[in-house]
């Protein structure tokens, strides 16, 4: 899962949106640096990542990547799940329009920015102003996201080419998303993530 899905599942679980978004920028035990609700959000994010990586649908989808891109498949798939969530938001969350959800999430996350790592603050400068969460629905933007990550981390250069794997298996990936994401939403609503 990437930013949008983590925020959405956190909302459904009544968890800290701030902690769920911050988690990738925190190493080790967060309890000494953040309030308990943010800490719980960080741990929820970590549980979701482990659970998602082990879902049969996700393991199957990783196998569809070519040898040269399989190493980055988990990252590429995380971004792709956000694409499907953004694209189908009106079906998934008909009572909370995406634009309103993004404004709500931004307000929640803004409360922790003064005490956050600089890299997280930098991400937030772009995430909200450039409307990444809304733009995830556009596959051209997904390609830009993958290229941007490859530019920032040369060891992940294969992300550029992983776009072709997404394109080649688009319909099958979308089908897998519909298999697992509603289950995750139900688990979040039961606070079982």
Swiss-Prot record:
InterPro entries: ACP_PD (IPR007431), ACP_phosphodiesterase_gpbac (IPR023491). It holds the Pfam family ACP_PD. It is an enzyme of class 3 (hydrolase). It catalyses: holo-[ACP] + H2O = apo-[ACP] + (R)-4'-phosphopantetheine + H(+). GO terms for molecular function: [acyl-carrier-protein] phosphodiesterase activity. GO terms for biological process: fatty acid biosynthetic process. Its EC number is 3.1.4.14. Keywords: Fatty acid biosynthesis, Fatty acid metabolism, Hydrolase, Lipid biosynthesis, Lipid metabolism. Coiled coil: none annotated. Belongs to the AcpH family. Converts holo-ACP to apo-ACP by hydrolytic cleavage of the phosphopantetheine prosthetic group from ACP. This is Acyl carrier protein phosphodiesterase.
């Amino acid at each position: 899962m990437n930013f949008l899905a983590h925020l959405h599942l956190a909302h459904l679980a009544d968890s800290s949106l701030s902690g769920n978004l911050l988690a990738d920028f925190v190493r080790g035990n967060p309890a000494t640096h953040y309030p308990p609700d943010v800490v719980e959000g960080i741990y929820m994010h970590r549980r979701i990542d482990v659970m998602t990586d082990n879902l049969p649908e996700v393991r199957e989808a990783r196998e569809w990547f070519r040898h040269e891109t399989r190493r980055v498949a988990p990252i590429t798939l995380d971004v792709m799940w956000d694409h499907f969530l953004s694209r189908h938001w009106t079906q998934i969350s008909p009572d909370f329009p995406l634009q309103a959800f993004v404004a709500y999430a931004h307000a929640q996350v803004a409360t922790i920015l003064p005490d956050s790592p600089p890299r997280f603050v930098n991400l937030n400068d772009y995430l909200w102003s450039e409307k990444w969460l809304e733009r995830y629905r556009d596959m051209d933007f997904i390609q830009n996201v993958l290229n941007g990550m490859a530019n920032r981390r040369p060891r992940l250069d294969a992300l550029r080419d992983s776009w072709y794997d997404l394109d080649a298996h688009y319909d099958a990936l979308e089908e897998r998303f519909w298999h697992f994401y509603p289950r995750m939403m139900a688990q979040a609503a039961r606070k079982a993530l």
